[in-house]
Amino acid sequence: MLLRLYNTKTKSLSEVKNFSDIKVYACGPTVYNYAHIGNFRTYIFEDLLIKSLRLLKYNVNYAMNITDIGHLTGEFDEGEDKVVKAARERGLTVYEISRFFTEAFFCDCEKLNIVRPDKVLIASEYIASMIEVIKVLEQNGFTYFVNGNVYFDTSLFKSYGQMAGINLNDFEFSSVSRVEVDPSKKNKSDFVLWFTNSKFKDQEMKWDSPWGFGYPSWHLECAAMNLDCFRSTLDIHLGGVDHIGVHHINEIAIAECYLNRMWCDIFVHGEFLIMEDEKMSKSNNNFITIQDLETNGFSPLDFRYFCLTAHYRTQLKFTFNNLRACKVARKNMLNKLTAVFSSLNQFDLLLLSKNYENIESVLEKRYYDSFLEKIAFDLSIPQALALLWDIIKDDNLSALSKLRLTFKFDEVLSLGLKEGVFREIEKDRINIDDAMNSLLEERRLAKIRKDFKRADEIREYFYSKGFVLIDTEEGTKVKRG
């Protein structure tokens, strides 16, 4: 089954046709602070895409960058390096800051069940590749050097800004109008490829280059690391909608002028998580971290469930009330699945351990195919989540089928359902001592001779000790009350 995704370049759905080697790149974090839940909404959407591709039998090569240099506080080459600024404020070196927040990022990803990329590209480790890209662009006539910086001349790249619908004649710095336009530029839309000592003298991370001792721009980093990692073209590029109007159109300009051909087929962008009608932003001091959620009594997977309730191309409004509702929903789902699991016999438990494809069931397969159709249609995850609830509630499905489908779907949804069910089962497991076993046997015999008073007395005794007796066809089960 082919995956279709909304392609920002074409403003339409594009089919992902190459099953054998899909090259996917995602813009990763700038490691100067903790990633916030607005960032993680994007990373969760990207995680859902990677896992959907794999469930649909695509062979995926997935890379993500870590920006530890060159990402300025202004998007248009203005301001100072975010990592340097954070290091100065905390009294640490830039290397200490970037290492600490890189580890913190992947720790949070693990809590959210976000898969680690096949390749993690650290920007400061690819300086040679970045210099090589500038050299080729320079040879091809796309750069100019002024006031100590190497600029990309956007007027020479005829399709510059097309993905964002930008007309160079009308180009304005609307998102940062408070910033004075650099008078060194030939065109307003030109951007820096390499900064030297002429700017930001406190920059700690610098390297020698043919243009002077300096450091690369954020836009160059992503393009150069892509080209180094995948050696040529890219199938899918991922990021947030805030990347469309500056970062990604600059990446396209660099890569296509370097390759002298089209670089990336499909660009996919996730929408904002908003708070009080504004996007969540570290620069606006308007953000919540995963640690903040945990402090307030939420599991990171409650937040993941929350993100699954909205399509990745729609804005999602965050409130703690909404998150609380998702916490309750996920808990209810786990409780229902735990009850289903408790009803399995030993033969079902054995079958549950087998691969999904080995068991035939018409209704089960219908649900499975429906799930694939939903994720294959532009990641219709809210509909896939609703389908999971339908499965849990469907009395025509056996307990075995419900669990097999749920655990298979959770390979994409990643709500920790299998692990959660096993934890609940383990919590309910009771170590019965000899005295309790004797009482259970006494109660069994009392019921046979219809001494229900004694049977109820024993039930009440267990209840007073924090246990509940559940009578089934297979005998009496003991659970914690």
Swiss-Prot record:
UniProt cross-references to Pfam families, sorted A to Z: tRNA-synt_1e
GO molecular function: ATP binding; cysteine-tRNA ligase activity; zinc ion binding
Top-level taxonomic group: Bacteria
Cofactor(s) it depends on: Zn(2+)
Cofactor info, note text: Binds 1 zinc ion per subunit.
GO terms (BP aspect): cysteinyl-tRNA aminoacylation
Key words of the record: Aminoacyl-tRNA synthetase, ATP-binding, Cytoplasm, Ligase, Metal-binding, Nucleotide-binding, Protein biosynthesis, Zinc
Location of this chain's protein in the cell: Cytoplasm
Motif 'KMSKS' region, chain ranges: 279-283
Principal place of residence: cytoplasm
Presence of the UniProt keyword Amino-acid biosynthesis in the record: no
Enzyme superclass (EC): ligase
Keyword Chaperone: no
EC number(s) on file: 6.1.1.16
Catalytic activity annotation: tRNA(Cys) + L-cysteine + ATP = L-cysteinyl-tRNA(Cys) + AMP + diphosphate
An example Gene Ontology CC term for this record: cytosol
Residues bound to ATP: 282
UniProt xrefs under InterPro entries: Cys-tRNA-ligase, Cys-tRNA/MSH_ligase, Rossmann-like_a/b/a_fold, tRNA-synt_1_cat_dom, tRNAsynth_Ia_anticodon-bd
UniProt binding sites for Zn(2+): 27, 222, 247, 251
Oligomeric form and interacting partners: Monomer.
NCBIfam families: cysS, PRK14534.1
Family the entry assigns: Belongs to the class-I aminoacyl-tRNA synthetase family.
Protein name (Swiss-Prot/TrEMBL): Cysteine--tRNA ligase
Organism of provenance: Borrelia turicatae (strain 91E135)
Organism ancestry: Bacteria, Pseudomonadati, Spirochaetota, Spirochaetia, Spirochaetales
